[in-house]
């Protein structure tokens, strides 16, 4: 099978990146040292090519009401242009089709950013719901492989770290209006050479920074200028350790179509209290939450916490969904679905090969804005 490639593929290869198959995409896992890339984001600034993710623009007079029924979180929270909201999109059984970010620009104009591996299915689902509800929303995917003819494809570069925003501003003065952006807000600016840039104060690392949504034809120039300004290229390996430390779920790993958001630490993104109906609401209300979603820190030596390892507790067994060695903490950490009677601070055991190693249950996240929140 031929892998799909982002517009930055040739640049990754020229930089000596180790490339891997990531859900059918040819993507950089690192450029030499995953730990150095991780630490650059925690202490300075790093950048990620996330152009495999898909922007989907929604337009029309009924867009808000359509999204009120499509998403588990409530888009009525979005009243200021540029404001963003994290949400799950559920099926009728309450399973997670995808997790995404929705941006509000005007009553007739919203933007979604969805995951790479789910993008085609997401678009199909959104179109089907649009038809079923008679919402008459115009749905326009913007990734190169799915953008309609005549529509400008978009690419995405995430610039993350304590110095990320100042390096973006100094490299692209046109983005300076974004200096007043609060977290989870976006601004659209015009660059004389690079065209329209959406600057979003969002990310997937637990650090401050921007995600830049740019014309695909100009993303190489943007990447090279940021690289020249000292923003370090970082691959999927560092992205995974950073998001794990930050307590951020990965679709397909920590939740999927067979998982309720209530069992994946995402109850805060689900609006069950208001009268608003949405796809999956009845199923979630009927089933409730069956498990907790918490963090683990390995206390014994002799292993690394990994997905699918069994967690043994006095209240019954649980399972790790994501695990890694944390460069920031120098400890092995994990997310786990655990029985409801397990408490933060409890000691549990994790089956690693033929051994049972002790781990401590902790509240997520592990690290935020460069500071350890656990010990």
Curated annotation (Swiss-Prot):
Transmembrane segments: none
Catalytic activity: N(6)-[(R)-S(8)-aminomethyldihydrolipoyl]-L-lysyl-[protein] + (6S)-5,6,7,8-tetrahydrofolate = N(6)-[(R)-dihydrolipoyl]-L-lysyl-[protein] + (6R)-5,10-methylene-5,6,7,8-tetrahydrofolate + NH4(+)
GO biological process, one term: glycine decarboxylation via glycine cleavage system
Disulfide bonds, paired cysteine numbers: none
Listed GO CC annotations: cytosol; glycine cleavage complex
Highest taxon in the source lineage: Bacteria
Pfam hit, one: GCV_T
InterPro entries in UniProt: GCS_T, GCS_T_bac, GCST_C, GCV_T_N, GcvT/YgfZ/DmdA, GcvT/YgfZ_C, TrmE/GcvT_dom1
Gene3D superfamilies linked to this entry: Aminomethyltransferase beta-barrel domains, Aminomethyltransferase fragment, Probable tRNA modification gtpase trme, domain 1
Annotated keywords: Aminotransferase, Transferase
E.C. designation(s): 2.1.2.10
Gene Ontology MF terms in the entry: aminomethyltransferase activity; transaminase activity
UniProt function note: The glycine cleavage system catalyzes the degradation of glycine.
PANTHER family on file: AMINOMETHYLTRANSFERASE, AMINOMETHYLTRANSFERASE, MITOCHONDRIAL
Assembly with partners or alone: The glycine cleavage system is composed of four proteins: P, T, L and H.
Family: Belongs to the GcvT family.
Cited HAMAP family: GcvT
The name this protein goes by in its record: Aminomethyltransferase
Lineage, highest ranks first: Bacteria, Pseudomonadati, Pseudomonadota, Betaproteobacteria, Burkholderiales
């Amino acid at each position: 099978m031929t892998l799909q490639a982002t517009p930055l593929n040739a640049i990754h290869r020229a930089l000596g990146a180790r490339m891997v198959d990531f859900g059918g995409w040819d993507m950089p896992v690192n450029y030499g040292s995953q730990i150095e890339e991780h630490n650059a984001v925690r202490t300075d600034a790093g950048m990620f090519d996330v152009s495999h993710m898909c922007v989907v623009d929604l337009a029309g007079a009924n867009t808000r009401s359509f999204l009120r029924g499509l998403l588990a979180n409530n888009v009525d929270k979005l009243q200021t242009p540029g404001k963003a909201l994290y949400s799950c999109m559920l099926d009728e059984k309450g399973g997670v089709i995808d997790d995404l970010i929705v941006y509000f620009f005007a009553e007739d104009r919203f933007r979604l950013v969805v995951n790479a591996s789910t993008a085609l299915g997401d678009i199909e689902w959104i179109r089907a719901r649009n038809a079923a509800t008679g919402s008459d929303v115009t749905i326009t995917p913007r990734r190169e492989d799915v953008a309609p003819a005549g529509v400008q494809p978009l690419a995405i570069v995430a610039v993350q770290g304590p110095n990320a925003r100042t390096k973006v501003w100094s490299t692209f003065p046109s983005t300076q209006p974004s200096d007043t952006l609060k977290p989870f807000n976006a601004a659209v600016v015009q660059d004389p050479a690079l065209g329209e840039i959406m600057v979003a104060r969002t990310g997937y690392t637990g650090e401050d920074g921007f995600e830049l949504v740019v014309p695909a034809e100009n993303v190489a120039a943007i990447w090279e200028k940021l690289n020249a300004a000292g923003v370090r290229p970082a691959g999927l390996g560092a992205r995974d350790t950073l998001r794990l430390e930050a307590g951020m779920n990965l679709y397909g790993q920590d939740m999927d179509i067979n998982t309720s958001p209530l069992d994946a630490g995402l109850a805060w993104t689900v609006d069950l209290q208001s009268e608003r109906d949405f796809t999956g609401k009845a199923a979630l209300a009927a089933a409730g939450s069956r498990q907790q979603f918490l963090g683990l820190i390995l206390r014994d030596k002799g292993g690394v916490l990994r997905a699918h390892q069994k967690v043994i507790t006095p209240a019954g067994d649980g399972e790790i969904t994501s695990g890694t060695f944390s460069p920031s903490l120098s400890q092995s950490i994990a997310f786990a679905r655990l029985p409801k009677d397990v408490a933060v601070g409890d000691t549990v055991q994790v089956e690693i090969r033929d051994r049972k190693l002790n781990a401590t249950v902790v509240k997520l996240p592990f690290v935020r804005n460069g500071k350890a929140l656990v010990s």
